[in-house]
Amino acid sequence: MKAMLLAAGRGERLRPITDRLPKALVPVGGKPLIAWHLERLAAAGCREAVINVSHLGEQIADYVGDGRRFGLQVAYSREASPLETAGGIAQALPLLGSEPFLLVNADTYCEVAFAPLVAHDLGAMLAHLVLVPNPVHRAQGDFSLEDGRVGSGSGARYTYAGVAVMSPRLVAPVQRGAKAPLAPLLYAAVDERRLSGELFQGLWQDVGTPERLAELEAQLAART
């Protein structure tokens, strides 16, 4: 299974750090965020990855290169301006192919095991989402989860972790080159009962602000 790492975002809330560094290259625990993902993908048996880039994207390409030092073969999907998540995926489909792929937000830190996801069979599902307990800044959550099925009901709700196994069919409605968010497509898949998921309760952190970045650094430092 190929992987796609989403790394095209501007990182407005992390300025001024992201005025000089793309968010995926912000250092955490002694290495850039994206390095954690690349190393874990290779360890999970993934051999090919696509990275979408836009803001300061050449810095990411210079750092990762062709991916060989991470044990991966890496290709780049370049966006003149960010196309949002679904738009970025649709733009990258010629590189991803027609089979399901593992989607990872490169600007989050997540210790979920990639190996079972790389081996996951979607069957008739359009996507399989990794969900996490709601962080303070997203207390309302995104989805419910019951018996492995993702919903939008009134039960316990969880936050989408930015990690998923996804079929290219999910973004079929999106025209290449068009800007499009992912959430409406996920909720449409919920309505069709074609979204599965799992709950991950290990270390996950959205590093969208300096405060969250500092919190993650403290958590990692406490382990050493």
Question: What residues fall within each predicted segment?
Answer:
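N-proximal low-complexity "stem/linker" segments adjacent to membrane-targeting elements
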Residues: 1-4, 10-16, 25
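A structural signal for short hydrophobic beta-strand segments in well-ordered beta-sheet cores
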Residues: 25, 143-145, 197
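Conserved N-terminal catalytic core of the sugar/cofactor nucleotidyltransferase
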Residues: 2-5, 27, 31-105, 114-116, ...
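Short beta-strand-to-loop element that shapes/binds the nucleotide-sugar donor at the catalytic cleft/hinge
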Residues: 55, 128-142
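Conserved beta-strand segments of alpha/beta enzyme cores
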Residues: 24, 73-75, 126, 194-196
